[in-house]
Swiss-Prot record:
The keyword Repeat does not apply. It catalyses: S-adenosyl-L-methionine + a thiopurine = S-adenosyl-L-homocysteine + a thiopurine S-methylether. Pfam families: TPMT. Disulfide bonds: none annotated. It comes from Francisella tularensis subsp. novicida (strain U112). Belongs to the class I-like SAM-binding methyltransferase superfamily. TPMT family. PROSITE patterns: SAM_MT_TPMT (PS51585). HAMAP family: Thiopur_methtran (MF_00812). This is Thiopurine S-methyltransferase.
Length: 226
């Protein structure tokens, strides 16, 4: 077990505290925008976004009329989101979480692995969007995360899962995730369809130093089950 598996929460809290958040995007994720139309959206749609940070993807969902429920460990990230986007909110204290509640958006400050404890407090959701949660977790924690999400997601939940695949195992996030791993961790209940794969043009120097020569952005979809 590596250091991140034993102290994953502190790793992410430190990165937010030190503003080491180069993963934050200035525009909605290109694969979310490209494949959003594949989701079955209606007036009551609610999207769960684990480890949401201050992602602008949340604004994209809101702009499409989809309510958002986020889970985020770093309170600094949550405050940044509401401040940067001038969204009014109220704060509600609960057991195992602190809730920042705005119009059509709720973000729970909590350890993602406390999700089963607070699941009954969440609005009913029909979409799970995962851009940065699964690939942020080391291998053992990804297995536990998948098991937990299967427990809290309704059977007909639509899932849009964005991951990365590398040609060399990485020691820091974002981690490489293969289709074989997803089948192993989710196949009991979830059947993912690979809908996109794009090779990254410019691999960061620190990845090249690890011996990495190829990276791919891969997108998986699990449609609503009827």
């Amino acid at each position: 077990m590596n250091k991140l598996e034993t102290n994953n929460n502190q790793y992410w809290l430190d990165r937010w505290q030190n503003d080491d958040v180069g993963f934050c995007q200035e525009s909605p994720n290109e694969f979310l925008v490209k494949h959003f139309s594949k989701l079955n959206i209606n007036d009551s749609s609610v999207c769960l976004i684990p480890m949401c940070g201050c992602s602008i993807d949340m604004l994209f969902f809101l702009s499409k009329g989809v309510k958002v429920v986020g889970i985020e460990l770093s309170e600094k990230a949550v405050l940044s989101f509401f401040s940067q986007n001038s969204i009014n909110y109220e704060v509600i204290h609960g057991n195992d979480y602190k809730l920042y509640k705005g119009d059509d958006i709720e973000i729970y400050v909590a350890d993602i692995f406390n999700l089963p404890k607070i699941a009954n407090n969440l609005p009913a959701f029909d979409i799970w969007y995962d851009r940065g949660a699964y690939i942020a977790l080391p291998n053992d924690l990804r297995t536990n995360y998948a098991k937990m999400m299967l427990e809290v997601c309704p059977n007909n939940t639509q899932i849009l899962l964005l991951v990365m695949e590398h040609d060399k195992k990485s020691q820091t996030p974002p981690y490489s995730v293969t289709q074989a791993e997803l089948i192993k961790n989710f196949s009991a209940k979830i059947k993912f369809e690979l809908i996109d794969s794009k090779q990254r043009d410019n691999i960061p120097d620190y990845r090249k130093a690890e011996g990495m020569t190829k990276q791919y952005y891969t997108t998986y979809l699990r449609k609503k089950q009827y």
